[in-house]
């Protein structure tokens, strides 16, 4: 059975895309069939896997086919990466979809309808959400079985987390009663600083009794930052690094929770 996980946080710079790439590549290393969905008009996931920005067939194309009720090949947009993970790419043209969806009946279900056509092909579908709570993110959360929330252990992280959790609760109540929280993942973690330790503890104290918080944290490392320009995962770029080890541990936690 295919599991759809949205990686979401309306705050940028929390390693959503890095986590999508490396969780996906790690699941492939564990023998799973995985497709990544770039649901952000910035196209960072697409570029982070080494693909160009000017692709003609993208997530936008697939969603437009759904909206217009056309017959189409749902696999047409899928790109195959050398590490075995598949990708449904995006670029800046997807930004127009956020506005277009407001005029569509059942507008929150367009992405879900498309992904349903792919579920028989994959064990996991990971959606890299845009850093906002607009219509595309609503579509991603409506299509997902669970949401994984990357959080950088900073002072203001708790405010953004509270806002996102309210949105998730609303979507659970109105559109997607099956939506669960996969967990909160601390990213870009620098355990040497007491401030980061205090902020992590504050989030654990506030949310830990109701929401799963991953035991594994993702460190702030040079190698993880450098992978974005190399078009590969941390496993291909520096497989013996702390970053690679941390994402492999995260994969095991996700698999245990499946």
Task: Indicate residue ranges for each PLM-predicted region.
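P-loop NTP-binding core
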Residues: 1-258
């Amino acid at each position: 059975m295919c599991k759809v996980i949205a990686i979401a946080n309306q705050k940028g710079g929390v390693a959503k895309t890095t986590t999508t790439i490396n969780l996906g590549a790690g699941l492939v290393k564990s023998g799973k069939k995985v497709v990544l969905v770039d649901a952000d008009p910035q196209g960072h996931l697409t570029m982070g896997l080494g693909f160009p920005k000017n692709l003609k067939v993208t997530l936008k194309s697939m969603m437009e086919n759904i909206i217009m009720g056309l017959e189409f090949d749902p696999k047409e947009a899928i790109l195959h990466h050398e590490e075995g993970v598949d990708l449904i790419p995006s670029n800046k043209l997807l930004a127009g979809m956020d506005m277009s969806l407001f005029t569509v009946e059942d507008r929150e279900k367009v992405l879900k309808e498309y992904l349903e056509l792919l579920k028989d092909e994959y064990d996991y579908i990971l959606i890299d959400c845009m850093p906002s709570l607009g219509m595309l993110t609503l579509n991603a959360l409506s299509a997902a079985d669970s949401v994984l929330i990357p959080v950088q252990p900073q002072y203001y992280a708790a405010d953004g987390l509270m806002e996102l959790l309210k949105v998730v609760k609303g979507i659970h109540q109105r559109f997607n009663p099956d939506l669960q929280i996969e967990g909160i993942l601390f990213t870009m973690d620098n355990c040497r600083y007491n401030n980061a330790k205090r902020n992590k503890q504050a989030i654990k104290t506030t949310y830990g009794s109701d929401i799963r918080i991953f035991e594994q944290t993702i460190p702030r490392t040079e190698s993880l930052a450098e992978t974005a320009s190399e078009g590969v995962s941390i496993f291909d770029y520096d497989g013996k690094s702390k970053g690679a080890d941390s994402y492999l541990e995260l994969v095991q936690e996700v698999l245990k929770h499946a």
